[in-house]
Amino acid sequence: MIFPIGIPMISKKRKSAQEAVSLREAAERRSQFARVPARSVSAPPRKKWFRSKQQLSGAADGMDGSSRAGSQEIVCDEFTKKLVAAITTWHDIHSSLLQLSIERSSNDSNEEHENVSVSSESSWSSASDSESDEDSATGRDSTNNHLSASAARFSISNPDLTNCQIKQMFPEMADHWRKALAKSPVVRRTAADQETSNPVNKHRSSRYWIEDEGDYHILPSEHVWLPSSTGSSASADSECYVGEKDCRRSGEKRRCAACHIVAHTNCFSLLAKLNLNCKTTFRDYATKKTPSKESTDGLTAHHWVHKWRHEGRCNTCAKSFQQKMFFQGKEKKETIAVTCSWCKESYHLKNCFARDKLEERCNRGALKEMIVPPTWILRLANRKRSSRTPSHPRKHKKSHRQFVVKPTDLWSSGPSQPLLVFVNPKSGGNKGSKALHTLCWLLNPRQVFDITSLKGPKFGLEMFRKVVTQLRILVCGGDGTVGWVLSTLDNLNWPAYPPMAIMPLGTGNDLARCMGWGGVFSDEPISQLMQAILHETIVTHLDRWRIDVEPNTSCNLEEEDDGMQSALPLTVMTNYFSIGADAHVALQFHHSRSANPQMLNSRLKNRIAYGGLGTIDLFKRSWKDLCEYITLECDGVDVTPRIKELKLHCILFHNITYYAGGTIPWGESSDNKPSCCDGKVEVLGFTTATLAALQMGGKGERIAQCSRVRVITNKAIPMQVDGEPCLLAPSIITLGFHSKVPMLKREKKTPCTPNLMRRGTRYGQKDSQVQSTSLIIQLPVIVVGRADYDNYKDCFERLKDTAYEIGIVNVESEAELDSARVLIQRLLVEHNSLPYEPDKNWRFLDYVSNAEEGTFRVSRQQEHVQSVSDVCNTDECLLILDHAFPSITDREAVELFQPQQPIPSTSTSAAPRYHNSRRISETLRIVLSSDAQETHL
């Protein structure tokens, strides 16, 4: 049998009798079997070669193991002995083979094999000169290490190697042996080890930004790989991007957050070989002074991505993309669309995509005014460390900035409002992580930062320091995340703060409510939020207040609490500062969550726990004697007598309108209406009863509106600043004005969704009355409930499975939604066996225009400007949301649904009704998909 590594004959030099077990003798035994040609290698050894009839009968009679082994030695012929010894030899050396790398190509495999043989021969010869058993073992280990180092360019785990190169390495090994080798558990384990050793950017950690001293190197066109979930949206591709012919079909499927391609982990190397890179996000320092035309075109051109499945409309013919169902072995998989990952332009690949688009300059689409182009983001050259020992080590601790954002002339029409995004993935359950991935698709991934992996916003703020005059900031998180960014800006000493918008993903979101962004971000596409930042915002200001704490030395504590602190957790207040019962409940909740973080890991659980603790405190009235331990002065006026008169349990210093998750404690009266930028803070008082009544529309007791507050405490009292509670020792607290920061306040103007902008120019016509040529189609109408919508709005296929079909309407594809509402409402009223009582305030659901993000409700105010084809696929169904419709869980508990009776359909005109088909006929479909520019029926 011939083996992969040519084991040479060992030198004829004889050694003493004491060196009986040496590497030389082992090599001689191996070479003896290697010189004997294999007579029947192509056939696997059968069991009858090892056992005779005598053995079988002996085994049946209870023959012991020693006698069976002796009979085997008698029966085995000479070839069998050699074959067994050869297999044993292979197991001795296979560990060295498995450590070799995958970079060696099949063309130079013979040359590399000779080099490996020569190096192994010299290694074995040198090892044979050892003088003891211990030295022999050491020589064998060094030989294996030498093999790994000198020929570290092979890997049995590589599929190409197991199929092609193993055949060249082992020409006399039969196919079944090579297949068995490829399926061995050792090979599978080695492949898994190699996969884990390569860094995969699963959640955009700090490795995406900071290069370590290892082998990892950040590339300008690096993919941002994420776990691919099947059916995540109506337009999510599930086919491997390398193609059906080259796909290895092994490994976990991952999806790039920046360009939305899908590939197996074992196909990543093929993507690099085929030059299927992601969109370029930055440029290197080497191309700064004299950039070539090729590098400039690569930074400013489109980044086209092929799609097997796509929603929306073609930018050339304005027709939707017909989805194809792929059946294994029956239809060839073809790409139906091509889209740019920058500007999001989409075209039919066969008829509508022009070749000159490949060299066209990309304008970055509807969000071009906030997308930071890759020509602006510069990666600086690495600084080499000096060999000299620094005389002052402290001066050399300053970290080196690896990236910097600087406007250049390469992009003449740069963004007027570049956006810097900070996302807290832990906020809002899974919403923060999903927002991070969606923003990487809509914007440049290099302008979106995970605030937790980088341990704060400092890295991103320093990177964008040179564009501070144009910069806008978007904070995706709660009020605490906003305060984190503002405090970091204070530490950086910026001369001016950029205006800040908020995506509310926290629990309370009172600051987001005050700025017009709402209390919960759940029913709006992120692309629409980006449009709102551009067109629906004004710059306002937010007051911030400084809190100084000094110990009250005149007060002697009788007993000290272990949790008592001498300073507040925050020194700058943005939302509110409270003393007493409110802070006591917050402190209890903080301790409960710290002790059991797994029990309080969602917004709903937090609200339930907070409400339960508040209810307990309502009856206990823990701080009913608060007025006995504090002295309060507002603008130099002592208001302590009023606190004692009202017997307050809580004192609140309020800066914004909302408090405790959307309540308005000051009231909505026009007199002395509070403002977040008037330079004054509102002082209110509560009892435990009025605190509980806030959630039902109650108000607090107004004490004062002032610009300076002084509080003296004579006892350790719980306090909280912007939701951060603590038990503060007796202190003298002074609250004064700190600064004003600009904020982006959202004001509802005109709708600015991409649908509305597209409809005006779809066919190049504006408000001109042209005879409609749209077809009357039979469109099924299905209804879903609110609970199912909240659970499955990110997965359209799963949401559709929970729906119930209420009937069919005959409607024009370009009919407006308000006219379709009349037809559907009539269908609900005339339904004979509807299993629930419908609500008149049902809503349309849009699963087409923002399919990359999920399904969203359509506002009633937008129904007169959106058509049926804008919110649904006319080949599938029209989806509506009814709050009265029971969820799928309730339907499983109660059998509501009976066999549906025939339902009369309604139409928008006197056209004949179609009873033989539920959808548009195949003939009309062919006409619509033809190459004709216009079709008249």
Swiss-Prot record:
Under the heading Gene3D superfamilies, the entry gives:
2.60.200.40, Probable inorganic polyphosphate/atp-NAD kinase, domain 1
Instruction: Indicate the family of this protein.
Output: Belongs to the eukaryotic diacylglycerol kinase family.
Pfam families (alphabetical): DAGK_acc (PF00609), DAGK_cat (PF00781)
- Which UniProt keyword terms apply here? ATP-binding, Kinase, Nucleotide-binding, Transferase
Where is this chain compositionally biased, Low complexity type?
Answer: 116-129
Q: Reaction(s) catalyzed by this protein?
A: a 1,2-diacyl-sn-glycerol + ATP = a 1,2-diacyl-sn-glycero-3-phosphate + ADP + H(+)
What domain of life?
Eukaryota
The GO biological-process annotations, alphabetized, read as: diacylglycerol metabolic process; intracellular signal transduction; phosphatidic acid biosynthetic process; phospholipase C-activating G protein-coupled receptor signaling pathway
One GO MF annotation is:
ATP binding
Q: List the disulfide bonds.
A: none
Residues covered by the DAGKc domain: 414-551
For this protein, the record's PROSITE patterns field holds:
DAGK
- GO CC list: plasma membrane
Q: Which InterPro entries match?
A: ATP-NAD_kinase_N, DGK, Diacylglycerol_kin_accessory, Diacylglycerol_kinase_cat_dom, NAD/diacylglycerol_kinase_sf
What is the official name of this protein in its record? Putative diacylglycerol kinase K06A1.6
Claim: Kinase is one of the keywords in the record: yes
Q: Could you say which EC number(s) this protein's record lists?
A: 2.7.1.107
Q: Where is this region: Disordered?
A: 44-69, 106-145
